[in-house]
Amino acid sequence: RQSLAVLAEARRQHQPGRCLLLGAHLEGPFLAPQKRGAHPSEHLCAPSLAELERRISGFEDDIALVTLAPELPGAEEVIAALRQRGVVVSLGHSAADERTARLAYQQGVGMITHCFNAMAGLHHRAPGPVGALLGSPPVALGVIADGIHIAPAMAALLQRLFPEQVVLVSDALAPYGLPPGTYPWDERSIAVADGTCRLEDGTVAGTTLTLPDGVV
């Protein structure tokens, strides 16, 4: 809520000719624990309308996008509540299979936060959320095109299959613009090398990528 308050104030102080802040992306807290990536487990919780209100009350107009795991019990009503408010709901940090993902798209989930990262891959016997895109309503496909999060060939495949739906995502973290090294990151430290941010255990946490760097 502290971050939302800062964003809301920045939006109120918008100056003509300056970058327009369209709204916050809440990547959590309704994430699958086994797919949490770099998100601390103590920050996660089960989806419910009460938990949603506790986090966004007073800032409803400042939130543009929410990432959640649609397979979690309670997610369906949270998705409906967010869509009613005009918030884009994105599948991410999720263990959803093809069937669950397809149902989520039909319920109004309109994006995949970062394709192939912290979610099931595209397997010939288990197509997962990406396979569920075929025959579903159009969904925006977030792609972290740093060559680490997703292989360049797979990024090119997505672009070929869904040319109007791919959205570049920088996934840039606080060390953006800083040289390689180790930096404090919340209560942890994060190592930056070759444009990639990793936790001490080697978990890929994000990038220091600019969006133009992802264009070839």
Q: What feature does the model see in each segment?
A:
Residues 78, 100-216:
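Active-site-adjacent C-terminal substructures of enzyme catalytic domains
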Residues 1, 68, 144-146:
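Conserved strand-turn element in the central/C-terminal portion of the radical SAM core barrel
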